[in-house]
A protein has these predicted regions:
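N-terminal hydrophobic/helix-forming segments and targeting peptides
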Residues: 1-464
Length: 464
């Protein structure tokens, strides 16, 4: 006799159906979804770069009693700690009463870097009496999308004397913005015959930053005028760009979309739309489990370097937890569980051929689990086990979470990767789960408020 399937038995319906979160929600629940999104929009506007997201997150958790952790310090049950990784990554540790040797650590990891335009180390030049800053794009972008939109400049500059200057120009209503020009349609006959890749060259993604020449100077007078302003306001000289990290990002705020305000458009949903709910879930959850909430850098370029998830820092911190609890680090890792909280591609009816409808994440139908990512034959993917997904199904069913399953587009069309494979390589069960996004990697992306809130709910259920 076949065992009864308790999930299907309640409805006497053995089919899989997605559920529209908005259709299920009553007026009170709609209000909760909307209110939660307001906090998220402020988080987005205050954090346009990975450094700003980390600073904003530290402020959030310090307000809840979290303290800075130093490697080597003992971690005690009940401690609320964070490790700030070079100002660009963050590890939030909530030390629980449960046995970490038996239960492991509940790990949530999202990334807080987003596609953008970085300034080159020698960026400033003048041409045709106009001053420009040269850029080098970061992450996967469609270059043409960055033309003719208002851009802000964020980041830090290390001066010759060792002091640090923080820049944020273009966000305040009274600030100037920066701009990349495009060719008018009247003269685009030749340009229109080229492919997008040939027509929009990376070396032409240069920011227009000035136009008033210094009086009495004949050569590079406009460039000198810009340098005079930078030196007067910030103490910056041209050589200081060598030790700077300056990022051009869209100078736009997060805004509701639609007459019914069902959606939020913003820069940086990928992956701050998962970072925010994993923070709020860590703060809100009522749990005895030890929780590690990670905000990682460098995911968009392969998770490389000291602030990416290929760095050994996560292992160091797990070892510190194990040592503090008197547990074997290998056993702690073996019994830990992880959700790689990263966005997925939402099914877009305008580009339906890029998807396989039945196995795509649909906007408004809840947070989406991707069993695997990768490309073509799952190349470069973490492929989560049936047992681990079965465990999460039970967790979410018990908590009444609305969620769905999906893949990143049609087979053989393209693909993508996340940090999941780096976590699972440590012998930790890991699966990708995040919010479906429309126009992913565009300067202005779109998500559903309902999907955002179900991510928060799912992450709470996971850590509890």
């Amino acid at each position: 006799m076949l065992a009864e399937n308790k999930f299907c038995e309640a409805f006497m319906d053995y089919t899989y159906k997605r559920q529209n979160v908005y259709a299920l929600a009553d007026e009170k629940q709609l209000g909760v979804i909307s209110e939660y999104a307001e906090g998220y929009k402020k988080f987005l506007d205050n954090g346009k770069t990975e450094r700003e997201v980390v600073a904003e997150s530290v402020a959030m958790i310090e307000a809840q009693g979290y303290k800075a952790y130093v490697l080597g310090d003992k971690i005690n049950p009940g401690d609320k700690l964070y490790y700030n990784n070079r100002g660009k990554g963050l590890f939030i540790i909530r030390a629980g009463k449960a046995d970490v040797a038996k239960n492991g650590v509940r790990i949530l990891v999202a990334h807080v870097d987003s596609p953008r335009l970085d300034l080159k180390q020698v960026p400033l030049y003048e041409k045709a009496d106009m001053a420009y800053l040269k850029t080098h794009y970061y992450g996967g972008i469609k270059k043409y999308q960055w033309l003719t939109i208002p851009l802000a400049l964020h980041g830090v500059v290390m001066l010759k004397d060792g002091s640090k200057v923080t820049l944020n120009v273009g966000e305040d209503e009274n600030d100037p913005v920066f701009y990349i020009t495009d060719l008018l349609p009247h003269l685009s006959q030749e340009l229109n015959t080229k492919t997008i890749a040939d027509g929009f060259q990376a070396e032409n993604l240069n920011l227009l930053v000035g136009g008033i020449p210094v009086k009495g100077d004949e050569k590079d007078a406009v460039k000198k005028g810009v340098l005079n302003i930078l030196n007067a306001k910030y103490g910056i000289c041209e050589e200081d760009f060598i030790s700077a990290e300056l990022e051009a990002v869209p100078a736009v705020k997060a805004k509701d979309v639609g007459f019914d305000r069902a959606y939020v458009a913003s820069y940086g949903h990928d992956d701050r739309v998962c970072a925010y709910p994993e923070i709020t879930a860590t703060l809100e959850a009522n749990t005895d489990q030890t929780v590690m909430c990670i905000l990682a850098d460098k995911e968009e370029i392969g998770s490389e370097g000291s602030t990416g998830m290929q760095c050994v820092l996560i292992n160091d911190l797990l070892n510190e937890i194990a040592k503090s609890y008197g547990a074997n680090p290998s056993v702690v890792r073996e019994n830990s569980k992880c959700i790689s909280a990263d966005v997925t591609a939402g099914f877009d009816p305008a580009f339906a051929s890029a998807f396989e409808d039945m196995n795509a994440g649909h906007v408004n139908f809840g947070v989406t689990m991707n069993k695997f990512t990768g490309a073509r034959g799952k190349s470069g993917s973490n492929d989560a086990s049936a047992e681990y997904i079965g465990y999460l199904r039970q967790v979410f069913a018990k908590a009444g979470i609305v969620w769905q399953t999906g893949e990143l587009g049609r087979v053989d069309l393209g693909g993508g990767g996340t940090v999941a494979k780096f976590i699972s390589n440590m012998n930790i069960d890991t699966v990708d789960m995040g919010v479906p996004v429309l126009s992913m990697h565009a300067p202005y992306e779109l998500i559903s408020k309902a999907d955002l809130y179900t991510a928060h709910q799912a992450f709470v259920a996971f850590v509890e």
